Amino acid sequence: MSFVARSLIRNVPLMGKAILSQQKQIAARLLHQTAPLAAVRVQQPAPDFKGLAVVDNSFQEVKLEDYRGKYLVLFFYPLDFTFVCPTEIVAFSERIKEFHDINTEVLGVSVDSHFSHLTWCNVDRKNGGVGQLKYPLLSDLTKKISADYDVLLDKEGISLRGTFIIDPNGILRQYSINDLPVGRSVDEVLRLIKAFQFVEQHGEVCPANWNPNSNPATIKPDVEESKKYFSKHG
């Protein structure tokens, strides 16, 4: 057997290990490039984001950090110039004062460009546009934000109707995701924020269907104290 042949045989295991190591490195790089930042979980920090948004008919960079100290309703919708989407977007805009009254901002997101958002904001609502909105629309053209919040439909390349309530410390408190054909309830989003704020301020918990106006009874989270609630509502 020649010297070259013997050398090849001796080095086969080393060559195999080198190839395997290279493959692992490539796989790790691909995973890092394509995977979401982290799983979206209630009680954990909301995934960070930043991008260009339409704010008062101009382009501005918007990032999660901008909303520290306030509650944020971050809601995703599929596309501009569609059917259910303008009804939701306008509904949030028409109720914006109610959100501001409880220290809350609203931010809409889709995979459209900021140019598309701007054009849509300049189409009359009677013609399927959204008109001048009282909160920003953020562009997620790269689809990174939608992927990080786990609402992206990979095949269609659009986002589901995800709604995320983020508290003043950047912690995710609640989220829900609707399938494409059904719009969400602004009333329910407001109710949830008020419930979280009530718990923070008073230390009592909010039962099913709690409402600060029509059904304000709460529960003290104590075995004995909770009996006062259940004796009346059980």
UniProtKB/Swiss-Prot annotation:
CDD domains found in the cross-reference section: PRX_Typ2cys
Record EC number: 1.11.1.24
Tissue expression notes: Expressed in thoracic flight muscles (at protein level). Detected in the head and body (at protein level).
Transit peptide region: 1-30
Reactions mediated catalytically: a hydroperoxide + [thioredoxin]-dithiol = an alcohol + [thioredoxin]-disulfide + H2O
Keyword Signal included in the entry's annotation: no
Annotated InterPro entries: AhpC/TSA, Peroxiredoxin, Peroxiredoxin_C, Thioredoxin-like_sf, Thioredoxin_domain
Catalytic center residues: C85
Record-level GO BP terms: cell redox homeostasis; determination of adult lifespan; hydrogen peroxide catabolic process; negative regulation of apoptotic process; response to oxidative stress
GO molecular function, one term: peroxiredoxin activity
Additional information: The active site is a conserved redox-active cysteine residue, the peroxidatic cysteine (C(P)), which makes the nucleophilic attack on the peroxide substrate. The peroxide oxidizes the C(P)-SH to cysteine sulfenic acid (C(P)-SOH), which then reacts with another cysteine residue, the resolving cysteine (C(R)), to form a disulfide bridge. The disulfide is subsequently reduced by an appropriate electron donor to complete the catalytic cycle. In this typical 2-Cys peroxiredoxin, C(R) is provided by the other dimeric subunit to form an intersubunit disulfide.
Oligomer status and interactors: Homodimer; disulfide-linked, upon oxidation. 6 homodimers assemble to form a ring-like dodecamer. Also exists as a monomer, however the monomeric form is present at a much lower level than the homodimeric form.
Homology family: Belongs to the peroxiredoxin family. AhpC/Prx1 subfamily.
Name under which the protein is recorded: Thioredoxin-dependent peroxide reductase, mitochondrial
Organism placement in taxonomy: Eukaryota, Metazoa, Ecdysozoa, Arthropoda, Hexapoda
Gene expressing this chain: Prx3
